[in-house]
Amino acid sequence: VDKMQELSSDGGKIDIGYIFPLAGHYIPHKVRKFLDMEKNKNVVFNFWQNHTPAIEKKVRSGELDVGFGGYLHKKDDMEFFPLINQELVIVTPEDHPLGKDEVVPLSEMGNYPVIGYDRESWMGTYARHLFKKYQIKPNMIVECPDEYSIVALVRENFGIALMPRTDILAKAE
């Protein structure tokens, strides 16, 4: 927010990049609050949604003023500020054997077809890290760019998925 205040001192344009899980509520809500302040009424926003590494690249090149993404390993020339924590959940089709369980061990991901995130996404990288750390060998049947795609495939019984609890899950229930 401080960076956005600095960029918008006399109106102007702010280019921001963000990851999909922030698109449904977080980014629109924060930008609306920012624009509702009288001193910011002349600011124009350009929005760009992508994976964390792509956002990082555009922030570094100056194409984006601010980026919102998953944590990347410490980089001396970039600052990272945690804004939100999202619980990870295993998403199953309605009639799936795991669908009745309130708590499901991560190890179950090795017993069913898995719908994952694109490899270059932060969540795809993180999920692969978790699977390796806990020696889980998932049967990854497809990789998707976003939560909408993942939820749609889960609904159609393609498999189960590990994803952050986002507003798309509330709509899917």
Spans of features found by a protein language model:
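Central regulatory/effector-binding core of bacterial HTH transcription factors
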Residues: G11-K75, C144
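Alpha-to-beta junction loops
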Residues: K41, V59-F68, L88, I136, ...
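Alpha-helical segments flanking ligand/cofactor-binding loops in enzyme cores
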Residues: E56-K57, F81, S107, V151-A152
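A ligand-binding cleft/hinge motif common to bilobed small-molecule-binding domains
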Residues: R60, G70-M78, Y126-H129, E147-E173
